[in-house]
């Protein structure tokens, strides 16, 4: 009985390891998770860049794919309407998560990608599903004042703030061509957080 349990657990570990693995290269930690439900597949890939000497601790790039065979049919690709349009807009989502540690809850009123200062930015809430996602131009930074009532508070512990920036496929293709990622975040207190790193995105098949 003990041997059966041991080999059962071993098989489970191998199975999980097949769908979930980590790879660290040049300060970038790579994760991939594949989940299947019915005939549908969800693939989540994350690329985490770690910072050492700053309140800005992590830059995380996330590519999420939802594969629904029924909606990938040629007829559906040419179809129009809310369901078809929503799937086309959301089947692949690109996102940057910026993780900033402080003793306060922060809001971020501006995100600037150097070289694309004229990019079209939206500030609607990151709720899905939403018709607004079908109208995403360059990138969305969410509502900067969603936690405004807490901005004045200071805490005796570290607050881990996360700014989620969803980018369009077209804008992703543009920043993928850059040699370096130069990004500036501006908080509700006008504090600037600057990023200047080698662009790791072209190294991966995205």
UniProtKB/Swiss-Prot annotation:
Keywords (A to Z) from UniProt: Cell outer membrane, Membrane, Plasmid, Signal, Virulence
Major site of localization recorded for this protein: membrane
Pfam families in the cross-refs: BPTA (PF17044)
GO cellular component: cell outer membrane
Compartments where located: Cell outer membrane
Family listed: Belongs to the BptA family.
This protein's name: Protein BptA
């Amino acid at each position: 009985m003990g041997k059966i349990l041991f080999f059962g657990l071993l098989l489970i570990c191998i199975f999980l390891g097949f769908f979930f693995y980590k790879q660290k290269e040049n300060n970038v930690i790579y994760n991939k998770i594949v989940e299947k439900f019915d005939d549908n597949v969800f693939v989540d890939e994350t690329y985490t860049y770690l910072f050492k000497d700053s309140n800005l601790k992590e830059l995380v790039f996330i590519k999420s794919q939802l594969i629904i065979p029924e909606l990938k049919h040629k007829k559906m690709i040419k179809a129009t309407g809310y369901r078809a349009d929503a799937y086309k807009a959301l089947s692949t989502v690109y996102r940057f998560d910026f993780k900033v540690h402080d003793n306060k809850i922060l809001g971020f009123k501006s995100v600037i990608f150097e070289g694309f200062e004229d990019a079209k930015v939206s500030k609607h809430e990151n709720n899905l599903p939403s018709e607004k996602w079908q109208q995403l131009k360059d990138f969305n930074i969410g509502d900067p004042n969603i936690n405004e009532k807490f901005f004045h508070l200071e805490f005796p512990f570290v607050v881990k703030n996360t700014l989620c920036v969803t980018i369009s496929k077209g804008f992703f293709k543009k920043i993928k061509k850059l040699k370096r990622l130069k990004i500036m975040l501006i908080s509700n207190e006008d504090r600037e957080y600057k990023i200047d790193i080698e662009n790791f995105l072209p190294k991966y098949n995205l």
